[in-house]
Amino acid sequence: MNKHLLAKIALLSAVQLVTLSAFADVPLTPSQFAKAKSENFDKKVILSNLNKPHALLWGPDNQIWLTERATGKILRVNPESGSVKTVFQVPEIVNDADGQNGLLGFAFHPDFKNNPYIYISGTFKNPKSTDKELPNQTIIRRYTYNKSTDTLEKPVDLLAGLPSSKDHQSGRLVIGPDQKIYYTIGDQGRNQLAYLFLPNQAQHTPTQQELNGKDYHTYMGKVLRLNLDGSIPKDNPSFNGVVSHIYTLGHRNPQGLAFTPNGKLLQSEQGPNSDDEINLIVKGGNYGWPNVAGYKDDSGYAYANYSAAANKSIKDLAQNGVKVAAGVPVTKESEWTGKNFVPPLKTLYTVQDTYNYNDPTCGEMTYICWPTVAPSSAYVYKGGKKAITGWENTLLVPSLKRGVIFRIKLDPTYSTTYDDAVPMFKSNNRYRDVIASPDGNVLYVLTDTAGNVQKDDGSVTNTLENPGSLIKFTYKAK
């Protein structure tokens, strides 16, 4: 194995020991979340009636650009007035009413002035599919922005035939300082709910024969790394002797991806009942899923492999593998012998095996009361002329379930976290994405159109405060 990777993993493992003893976040109570009101910010809704908004970027034209997952629309918004224009609508985007598919990734070329490219990923019909339950594919595509006509043209499919389902699409796309595309693709919801008996592929990588045949089914549960033309970088890691688009493996639903000023890649990832993760992405790293959720600590999670169950009529007890129906093979995290495991920088949240996953406060929507917060993206705050005091080296992580945005402080090298995740902006909203203005004193936040969120009293509501909105939070300097 690469000596550089070994050194990084050793460092992260040492950090994990510190994290477990000092920085392992304890789940907050609803009353604690209710206090996260952030009085030092003025709130203003500048745009509403969006249809499943997903990605949010500050454009090279100093305007806000955002996407609608349901419609395939790419919108440009004036950050002051909220006036909006539809720049383009990606044709033939597939979005199921009950699915996480649609228009997903969105990024500008770093040198947009000389290379006016916009990169997207999305769900499209797969003409080669013979599976009625899985008829779609994910495509990573490049468009050229035409300034004269103010629209997108000349589509080029960089990578087609990627896995797609209704669940765990992830779909965050960023371009790194190395001029490579980084893309998160989830495990497609395998081993749970509608896909309970489908084998999870997060630990699998392609053979050379599969890669040559453009069979990408093992790309589920990965972070991919592509050249800007979609080809495989020569310096990508080798897995079982094969160099593919895969950069890291062992992911569940990594919906957040962001580079730091010093070139490190941070990621937020949704866990099962417990252990949402904040990760530092390391070349060739294995992040454990589905064998490990969070730390390799045998705490609150075990891998129940329903695809190996003989009886395909049994039900998931929704106990995070700690309790399962008879006949389901279960392995503890400590029993997993996978190589190159990279522990998270932080979890939200880790609990013991005795934790009650059936809190009656949430009624039938018990998943809302689970320790997880459902992190939906990640944004590295870079400050500016009006930077918020004390926010240096900060990662912002929106939550879908808790109606907050977490502020996570990291050390100056972005290698470890300093303190607990601090919740802010509590409301009955499902926060989807967040960015800051170039000056650093204004945050812009997208909210989901629909869904469930936990109220201040701990119960569940689907009546959202600002559904499908772009909200402006302006810092009031003391």
Swiss-Prot record:
Q: What positions does the entry give for pyrroloquinoline quinone binding?
A: Y367, T372, K401
- Which Gene3D superfamilies does this UniProt record tie to the protein? TolB, C-terminal domain
Q: How is the cofactor bound?
A: Binds 1 PQQ group per subunit. Binds 3 Ca(2+) ions per subunit.
Q: Where does Ca(2+) 1 bind?
A: G271, P272
Q: Does the keyword Flavoprotein apply?
A: no
Biotech: how is it used? Potent biocatalyst for the accurate in vivo monitoring of blood glucose in the management of diabetes.
> Which one of the record's GO molecular function terms can you name?
metal ion binding
Any idea which positions bind D-glucose? Q100, D167, Q192, R252
Signal sequence: where? Answer: 1-24
**What cofactor requirement does the entry state?**
pyrroloquinoline quinone; Ca(2+)
Q: Tell me how this protein assembles.
A: Homodimer.
The job of this chain, per UniProt, is described as: Oxidizes glucose to gluconolactone.
Question: Which protein is depicted?
Answer: Quinoprotein glucose dehydrogenase B
* Species name: Acinetobacter calcoaceticus
Phylogenetic lineage? Bacteria, Pseudomonadati, Pseudomonadota, Gammaproteobacteria, Moraxellales
